[in-house]
Amino acid sequence: MTVNLDPDKVWIDGCFDFTHHGHAGAILQARRTVSKENGKLFCGVHTDEDIQHNKGTPVMNSSERYEHTRSNRWCSEVVEAAPYVTDPNWMDKYQCQYVVHGDDITIDANGEDCYKLVKEMGRFKVVKRTYGVSTTEIIHRILTKKSLPPTHPDYYPTTQELSFYSVAQDAVSKHCYVFQRDLDNVLVNGGYKFDAEDCVYVDGDFDLFHMGDIDQLRKLKMDLHPDKKLIVGITTSDYSSTIMTMKERVLSVLSCKYVDAVIIDADATSMSQYNCEKYHIGTAVLTAAGKFSEYLTKELIVKRVESQREVYIARNQKKGMSI
């Protein structure tokens, strides 16, 4: 049977556990391999059972990982229960000629390269893996209770990184604005005319940015204020109480399709002079009746890791990370 592959369709797959800005960066780069106007990116996400068999217990369950990936600005469609070893027949089903992956090796339970077959078929494209961020690294910080201090050179994002993650759904055009502390200090200009009076604002530290947070952002953007732009203020807190750096939190939030602007190091006065609705993440008005927001919190995620502490310590040790 002849399969008609579409050059404007591309495939990426993965566990997308603790869907962080490294995953988002790979998704963004994959979207850029197809046309700005008509490109479509299919994100295949593995089941809990497949991950358990090939890699070990995921922290986030299938439903959480599917929906988090679906909330990514550059993901056109999530393909649930995609096989752990990339199958060209699945790519054919969605008319994708190529699969995109980072410049690292992913192996299955037998120690085989998950992309061996598609590489041999010439249907594999490589993008640059994001340095210094991984699910393994985040789990390591939870286990050791150690985070990077604000004085670390990689604690804050560069302007180049902010510009890269601020692009629109087509992965090229400008979209998100980025501010420092308040709206007077613009770091990145967005792709629309900004008016603070035409926005809704929510703040929080957005540590371990997860579907509980995203549920609330979706509610603000789609239900409570569908005619407003959504500004997210990412607050500074005692660094020892946050697991992720400001860079990791900001870039993760920028990748969310419900977000139109971000304020880095926001504080209580950042938006006080503006006549717009203001919220705080995690409050009842935002969490009520949310599929994920009613139960999923940073604290619950930490408990999941701690409840299987020995399992994750052993898994991380295999990757060269000792407690």
From Swiss-Prot:
Alphabetically ordered keywords of this record: Cytoplasm, Lipid biosynthesis, Lipid metabolism, Nucleotidyltransferase, Nucleus, Phospholipid biosynthesis, Phospholipid metabolism, Transferase
Cellular component GO terms, alphabetical: cytoplasm; nucleus
Single GO BP term: phosphatidylethanolamine biosynthetic process
Main location: cytoplasm
EC top class named in words: transferase
MF annotations from Gene Ontology: ethanolamine-phosphate cytidylyltransferase activity
Protein's UniProt keywords contain tRNA-binding: no
Entry's localization field: Cytoplasm; Nucleus
Family membership: Belongs to the cytidylyltransferase family.
Annotated function: Ethanolamine-phosphate cytidylyltransferase which catalyzes the second step of phosphatidylethanolamine biosynthesis. Involved in the maintenance of plasma membrane and required for proper sporulation.
Protein's name according to its UniProt entry: Ethanolamine-phosphate cytidylyltransferase
Name of the coding gene: ECT1
